Amino acid sequence: MATAASTSAAAVAAASRLLVRRAPPRLLRRLPRAALAASRPSPPSSSSYGAAAVALGRQPLGHRARMGHTAAAAAAAGPALGLTKPNAVEPPQVSFAAKDVEFSEWKGDILAIAVTENDLVKGSDSKFENAVLKKLDGQLGGLLSEASAEEDFTGKAGQSVVLRLPGQGFKRVGLIGLGQNAPSTTTACKGIGESVASVAKSAQASSAAIVFASVGGIQEDFKLTAAAAIASGTVLGLHEDSRYKSESKKVHLKQVDLIGFGSGPEVDQKLKYANDLSSGVIFGKELVNSPANVLTPAVLAEEASNIASTYSDVFTATILDVEKCKELKMGSYLGVAAASANPPHFIHLCYKPPGGNAKRKLAIVGKGLTFDSGGYNIKTGPGCSIELMKFDMGGSAAVFGAAKALGQIKPPGVEVHFIVAACENMISGTGMRPGDIVTASNGKTIEVNNTDAEGRLTLADALVYACNQGVDKIIDLATLTGACVVALGPSIAGIFTPSDELAKEVAAASEISGEKFWRMPLEESYWESMKSGVADMVNTGGRQGGSITAALFLKQFVDEKVQWMHIDMAGPVWNDKKRAATGFGVSTLVEWVLKNSS
């Protein structure tokens, strides 16, 4: 991801050879040949694509034979740095059911009641005026009104309290504040689900029910969406990524009943959808949370292959190694990958619907930098956040999270290609240098004036590859620019597209997902700053309008006949307060695919 803190550090390449140059001859005679070979400069070349041939002791055959690493280099990589391995922690497994029962007769661990501030209004007799609360309070002998007053519960949004009330069919009552009004958005309903998870965790409950005090508070045409959002919010609220902690917390909640949302196949299908979607979001979050010494490009490819194996009735996986990427002339992608000891993996999952009758073909492309050091324009200085650059594969996490969810949902009538050019952007003697020129697979040449603007270089070849699949529409997602975070803040992703139709589709999908997007301009006049004197283009323009020029760069690698959208998600990929990934993008992508299915 390009950041303002990037700076050139060309002298780093020579540092590894300094000791050997100064060592006395007697010491040089004692050094093993491998150490001496590593200390010598690589043979001169017109490119910076890597030196697999040199590493194997052979003379180079020109830059096309030296673009990256080999399978032998991958095998020699050894175990994960620091011997870190994730613990086997199962994500929350919760069953949801919509029930038409009287809430006061429900039996289980905790009855969660969602209340507005107005629901808590009391009459002159100090009793609740709301029918649901009044009935429950009477059943409890006035304990509910007394306990809520003692806890100073006022029904404000986000407020919750758990009351122990023995002797009932339910062991506890949880009150969840909604604010002044009943929820009317997906985001608000997800928040209710998160509150259900919170009160259930505090009570270590294995079963829960959710009911609204204002029976008519949720609009009838919104109930199905609300039920799914509450279920999704509950699962995501229960999830805590403890794979890298010495102790993990157990999830007790196994059953949640939704009362007052109707019953039957339609609502049951919505609740299943919520569970399927949540599993994809959790998968995406866990990919981003994984450190770079564990989640290498090879491991990311393995995770993608596992999706294809698990849902083999609708998925196939193709993983391209370096040699195949050379054949496809992916010089832009391989240039970024050249410095890393971990070889790149180009990942292509293909979803074909049951029955194989697809009326539309879509592609979803994700940036897959499993770590971004910035390269020779190394990230340094305050605010560079180099320690967080494991999240530079957030676009690919959204892609594969959506793939996992869609493998379970199995939408008809649509074929979807999930494409990620996975690699690391590191620093070494084989690395891409500022000023190098790389050639993308569509033949366009790029002068690299900033090695920390690497994501767009990998996406260039990925977009060309996507267009070659004969797709109708492409969405790419990337943690691409700090400029977009400056413009839109940490919660909103920027979208760039010349297609009004595609913009409307994603806007409609985001209304259901609750994720926030803002359409940004593709100002063509800004392309002037992207022109090179020696190549077709440079990879970065000036500081002003950086997210726009980045999008204009990507546009050069998309066929004009294909509808295309770029999503810059550098802000919402990460939650600074929780110090964890958000799973952003998965829900909107799934909704978009469903809207394109028959």
UniProtKB/Swiss-Prot annotation:
Catalytic residues (UniProt): K379, R456
Cofactors required: Mn(2+)
GO BP terms, alphabetized: proteolysis
Cofactor note (record): Binds 2 Mn(2+) ions per subunit.
Gene Ontology terms: cellular component: chloroplast; cytoplasm
Chain positions recorded as Mn(2+) 2 binding sites: D372, D452, E454
Catalytic reaction list: Release of an N-terminal amino acid, Xaa-|-Yaa-, in which Xaa is preferably Leu, but may be other amino acids including Pro although not Arg or Lys, and Yaa may be Pro. Amino acid amides and methyl esters are also readily hydrolyzed, but rates on arylamides are exceedingly low; Release of N-terminal proline from a peptide
One Pfam family from the record: Peptidase_M17
Protein localization: Plastid, Chloroplast
EC number: 3.4.11.1, 3.4.11.5
HAMAP family, per the entry: Cytosol_peptidase_M17
Subunit structure: Homohexamer (dimer of homotrimers).
Protein's job: Presumably involved in the processing and regular turnover of intracellular proteins. Catalyzes the removal of unsubstituted N-terminal amino acids from various peptides.
Protein name in UniProt: Leucine aminopeptidase 2, chloroplastic
Organism (species): Oryza sativa subsp. japonica
